[in-house]
Amino acid sequence: MKYMIHCCPKRLWYVEEYLIPSMLLQGIDRENIIVWNDTNEWGNQKSWYESCRYIKENESLDEGMWHIQDDVIIANDFYTRTKSVPNNINVRCGFVTERFNKNGRWWKGIQPIQHHWMSFQCIYIPNKYTSEFVFWYDTYVVKDGNFKKQYEGGNDDDFLFFKCVSQLHPTIKSINMIPCLVDHIDYLIGHSTLFDRKGKKNRAFYFKDKWLVDELRNKLMQRR
């Protein structure tokens, strides 16, 4: 299993000093970790597009990989729960927020694909879908003047991918993994704080290893 960390240069220090070491400690081989560092400062949307093109040109389209962002902390059983995927059809979300838990329905695990896109903090995507995104973007987004004007240059990488997969594969499912595989700790490492539409911080609905967050906070305080 391969893992791609989507990183901006300002957070590379956290990825190299904390995130990757925590992955190695659980048994993930370094050669299976791809750090996609946005050194060109493309921004989320362009960087996501280029990472999809990289996968299309360099990775097997019969396989898939986990995509995680540079401002997360992984659960203590992250590798155990991500190292194998029973099938290569559905998307798997390792990050689910409280606002999706309506009447407990997210505990059921499997939802229609149109709900998956909010979980780009940690998501498993079959490589064939990321490859198809390149064609879809070039065909539908670039050629649609209004669509391109609305989203070009923005941070709508997750939304654009949601639109792509919903259009091309409307029958696939999103498998939501609870307890969550990661928690969002941008507030500890700086440079952005994401909020949902209700103004609440974008945190995992259920991250069982809160002690890891406390441990990281202490390490970061010592680092300063």
PLM features: residue spans?
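Peripheral/terminal regions associated with large enzymatic or DNA-binding modules
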Residues: 1-68, 72-224
